[in-house]
């Protein structure tokens, strides 16, 4: 009976594991270079969004994933505001093969972080007295697939740090 329990525990140790440990804001910035004059102008914004993800292996099976959202909003030719958030998470990820680990860190984890980053950015913008910034959902699986395709065409090998 003891051997069966031991063997069962060993089998469980090799099963894939995923657990969110913590979500936090790593960095946050907001600039409104043309305030207060910008508030008196007719509001006709154009929005440019840049997003980026980075991963870093921590001790053991822990990984940090950082999703950076940078937004530049112009009103006409003038920059109304620039806002950036680095939303980070610590994830316990174990017993995945290399392709699954790469996908988890490059698409699954950023997908978890995005709603937090979007809400933080929206709150920051409204606290700057600008209209709410309603960012559309992002398909991180599609972005990940595009990046893998680009790397394959360039002859690069994806790496997990």
Swiss-Prot record:
What Gene3D superfamilies does UniProt report for this protein, alphabetically?
SecB-like
Q: Please provide the Gene Ontology terms (biological process) for this protein.
A: protein folding; protein tetramerization; protein transport
Question: What InterPro entries has UniProt attached to this entry?
Answer: SecB, SecB-like_sf
Q: What's the main place this protein lives?
A: cytoplasm
Keyword set includes Lipid biosynthesis: no
The listed locations are:
Cytoplasm
Q: Which UniProt keywords apply?
A: Chaperone, Cytoplasm, Protein transport, Translocation, Transport
Q: Which SUPFAM superfamilies match?
A: SecB-like
Q: Which Pfam families does this entry report, sorted A to Z? A: SecB (PF02556)
Tell me the superkingdom of the source: Bacteria
**Which molecular-function annotations from GO does this UniProt entry contain?**
unfolded protein binding
* Example of a GO cellular component annotation carried by this entry: cytoplasm
Assembly and interactions? Homotetramer, a dimer of dimers. One homotetramer interacts with 1 SecA dimer.
Q: What does this chain do?
A: One of the proteins required for the normal export of preproteins out of the cell cytoplasm. It is a molecular chaperone that binds to a subset of precursor proteins, maintaining them in a translocation-competent state. It also specifically binds to its receptor SecA.
| Family designation | Belongs to the SecB family.
Tell me what this protein is called: Protein-export protein SecB
Organism, scientific name? Pseudomonas putida (strain GB-1)
> Its gene?
secB
